[in-house]
């Protein structure tokens, strides 16, 4: 007997919905134009629409599996209203070297630190070098507080906390290069090449 199970998860904001969706999607999946974004695999169709993350699973649907899932998904999407879009801040990630659909949203404890709150990340590969970029969005006061606590946590000596670039020797993540400007902190992980990290920190601006 053929059947389809639909699970609809409502989140606090579209960004939080994207966060869970982004943790589960595969960057090389078969993506679809449904909701803000969706993808289909055998017996599975997941998509994001507004503040909702929708997951469909099919059973015994045979050769028409994908068509059946898509028809169900379209109906659900229509009933949930405005489809929204992927978080606008994702457009700030430089395109060069970025792995398509590798962007993620970490809701809390970025890098394992409670004071770093939430962050968006994306995976990169350039000339055989794999690395990760991130951006944190907050207000200016909180950004300053995050920088200060990070410096204290890693026992980095910095008397005056001001906007600009920082190099932090993190005992768990190695050297982290970041830039604070206004309500944003952005940075790069896993890069030892000075020119490469400078290039990408600049591209974020």
Question: What kind of region is each of these model predictions?
Answer:
Residues 1-205:
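Soluble, non-membrane globular domain cores that form compact, hydrophobic packing
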């Amino acid at each position: 007997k053929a059947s389809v199970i639909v699970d609809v998860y409502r989140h606090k904001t579209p960004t939080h919905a994207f966060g869970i969706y982004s943790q589960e999607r595969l960057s090389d999946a078969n993506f679809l134009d449904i909701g803000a974004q969706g993808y289909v695999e055998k017996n599975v169709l997941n998509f994001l629409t507004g503040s909702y993350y929708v997951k469909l699973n099919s059973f015994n649907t045979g050769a028409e599996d994908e068509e059946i899932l898509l028809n169900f998904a379209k109906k659900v999407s229509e009933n949930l209203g405005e489809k929204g879009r992927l978080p606008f801040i994702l457009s700030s990630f430089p395109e060069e070297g970025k792995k398509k659909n590798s962007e993620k949203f970490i809701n809390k404890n970025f890098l394992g630190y409670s004071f770093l709150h939430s962050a968006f990340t994306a995976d990169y590969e350039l000339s055989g070098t794999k690395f990760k970029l991130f951006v944190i969005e907050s207000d200016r006061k909180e950004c300053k507080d995050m920088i200060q606590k990070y410096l204290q946590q890693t026992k980095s000596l910095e008397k005056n906390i001001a906007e600009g670039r920082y190099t932090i020797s993190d005992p768990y993540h190695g050297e982290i290069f970041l830039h604070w400007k206004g309500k944003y902190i952005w940075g790069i992980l896993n890069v030892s090449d000075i020119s490469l990290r400078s290039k990408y920190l600049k591209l974020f601006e």
